[in-house]
Amino acid sequence: MKQTLILAFLALASVAQAQIRQERNLDKWQFSRDGKDWQQVDVPHDWAITGPFDRKWDIQHLAIEQDGQTEAIDHTGRSGALPWIGKGEYRTTFRLSAGTKHTTLYFDGAMSEPVVYVNGREAGRWMYGYNAFRLDISPYVKSGVNEVRVLLNNQEESSRWYPGAGLYRPVTLITAGDARIDPWATIFKTVNLAGSKAQVYVETQATTPKGKGATRVAIKLLDANGRAVAQKNLAVNAQGMVAAQLNIANAKAWSPEQPYLYTLEVSLYQGNKLADRLRQRVGIRTVAVSKEHGFQLNGQSRKFKGVCLHHDLGPLGAAVNKAAIIRQIRLMKDMGVDAIRTSHNMPSQMQMQVCDSMGMMVMAESFDAWKEPKVKNGYNLFYDQWWRKDLENLIRGHRNHPSIVLWSIGNEIPEQWNKEGAQRAKDMTDYCHQLDNTRPVTCGGDNPKANT
């Protein structure tokens, strides 16, 4: 009888533990180009970087209008002559305990057009290979072993540079209870910064099932040594929303010269029981732009000493690699650079985390094209249905990074010359400001006389 009680207690403890948020990096996968021959790979993984080189992967037949071309001709040398074009498939398994209530798959990027299957059923898909996306796979999973398959398709003439191919950014499995916090609905922003005094605003959204006791949220801001410099306890309202303003007496501002980071800790309680906890690295800093003072960081006017940085890592390929990203940022800082533009696409979380910690300002860019194409099978195929979804994921997923000081909605857009382009620019700018009212929005144009 005593042994039975002990076993029952351990089982309940295991279930209770499973309710708290857990994140697991899914890094061991099998990969195949044809669905027949499989190899073991580590994700992040770029299937094309190992070659072989061949001119056929690189031919694009078009007229580059920016270069004054009026007739289509063959172009080569744009996308690396590596075998990134075509289809590929990844598969892996993971195990869930019986107490798991909510399960999410987070893809930080998958090149390209990923379709995700869980236990043989389609769980979701995305189009843009540079964007992060989340899938609630709770309806498709079971206790025990579960299988995930990801199908990818890189169309020919879909990129003006080497995009890489495959699950080139991390894939994360997130499990949580039925009471949980939404990381993408958690907002941290600096309201006021005057000397060493700061006011910050924190907002979060919680899912709180009824009938399980009163729910509250504890918000803490921790310094680099883990000490709480501000905290509040608040009841969750009927919509699951919590908002608070915190005062920090001896605030340390984030800047490229002193990239000081705090930790935002948000804890959700049902009664006295911890139901979920979220931690994010954040920085206290202000951004402003005006015709009188130009760009200002923390109230000080400064000019960007910036570079355009594509996402690939040279001979390492497109698969994100923290050591290689740190090396890139260190080299640029050594040469006097204090800002990067994520040319010409959405960045990885890993890259932004490095920029946060090392002190590199960022213009986070979105698209190389809108509805009018630069290449035959570019983002123009998806623009109408997907631009709002893509901007939403970019901004909700990255808006708490202190390094990001500007959003960019495009690069050298072909329709910059017409009224349709001007309207699209306005629509996207308004939507960016709706999601984040703390940062300016820009677009990388190539002619000052354009309508946009």
What are these regions (language model features)?
Residues 23, 29-32, 80-183, 209, ...:
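Accessory beta-strand-rich segments of carbohydrate-active enzymes
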Residues 329-330, 339-452:
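Substrate-binding/catalytic cleft of secreted carbohydrate-active enzymes
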Residues 18-71, 147-153, 173, 224:
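Accessory carbohydrate-binding/adhesion or oligomerization-edge regions at the termini
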Residues 185-188, 265-332, 353:
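N-terminal carbohydrate-binding accessory modules
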Residues 9-17:
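Hydrophobic h-region of N-terminal signal peptides that target proteins for export
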